[in-house]
Amino acid sequence: MAAPRNLTGDGGARQLVKDEESPAASSAAKGLLNDDSPTGKRTKSERFPLSRWEFAVFFTVFLVFTTGLFCIYLTMPAAEYGKLKVPRTISDLRLLKENLGSYASEYQARFILGYCSTYIFMQTFMIPGTIFMSLLAGALFGVVRGFVLVVLNATAGACSCFFLSKLVGRPLVNWLWPEKLRFFQAEIAKRRDRLLNYMLFLRITPTLPNLFINLSSPIVDIPFHVFFLATLVGLMPASYITVRAGLALGDLRSVKDLYDFKTLSVLFLIGSISIFPALLKRKRVYE
C-alpha cells in the first residue's frame, strides 16, 4: 500500500512543478513572439508590415511614377535606349557619360527632364545610386548647374519620400528600425525648441543615413517646413563635394574616395557650426 501512496505523491509533485513552470514558459514564449529586434524571429503576421490597403497605396504611387518616367523615356531617340543604365560603379558612370554626352548637349531640356525625373524617382522609393547621379551632374553640367540640379532634385525626392512615408511608412519603419526609431524620437523630443539646428546637423553630417531621416521624420512628428529647410540647406555641402568630384571621374577609383577622413572632418565641422547657436542659447539659459 505504501507504493501507491509514493506514486501518487510523485505524480502530484510533478504536476505541481509543471503548473508552476507553465507561466514562466508561457512568458518566455510570448517574449520570443514579441521580440522586436531586427534579428528576432517574427511571427507570420509581422513578416510583412504593410496592410493590403497600405501596399495598394504604395503600389499605386509607384505605378504613377513609373508611368511618367516611361513616357519621358519614350521621348528619347530610339538609338539612345540601349545606352540608358543606372550606374552602379565608377566604370559604369564613365561609360554612361561618354554615351550620353552628345545627347545631353543636343537635347538639353529633354535630358534634364529625364535626369530630374529619374533622380526624384530613386529618392522617393529609396533606390540606391543617387550618388552616381550627382557625380554625373558634375561631369555633364559643371559645378554650378550640376550643384543646383542635385540640391533641388535631392530636396524634391526627400520631400516626396517624406509624404509617402507619412501616408504608409509607419509600420515599415517600425519593422525595420524599431530601436533606432525610438532613439530618434527621444532625441527629437529633447530638441523641440531648436529642431531646425538639430536637423541641419543630421543632414550635413553622416550621423544618420539620409534614407532613415526621410522615412522616419514624419513618424516622429517633424514639421514639414523644418524638414524642407534642413534638407535644402543641409545637403548643400555634401552635394558640392560630390558634384565637384564629377569633374574628375578619371581620378576616382570608387565612391569611398569621395569621403575620406579630411572630407568627413569638414562636414562635421560645418555641422557643428549649425548647432553652435543652440549650444550658446542653452549656456545663456543656464547662466
Swiss-Prot record:
One of its GO terms (cellular component) is endoplasmic reticulum. Coiled coil: none annotated. The modification Phosphoserine is found at S37. The chain crosses the membrane at residues 55-75, 124-144, 147-167, 218-238, 260-280. Residues 1-44 are annotated as: Disordered. It holds the Pfam family VTT_dom. InterPro entries: TM41A/B, VTT_dom. Keywords: Membrane, Phosphoprotein, Transmembrane, Transmembrane helix. It is found in: Membrane. It comes from the Eukaryota. The keyword Aminoacyl-tRNA synthetase does not apply. It is a multi-pass membrane protein. This is Uncharacterized membrane protein At4g09580. It comes from Arabidopsis thaliana. The lineage of its organism: Eukaryota, Viridiplantae, Streptophyta, Embryophyta, Tracheophyta.
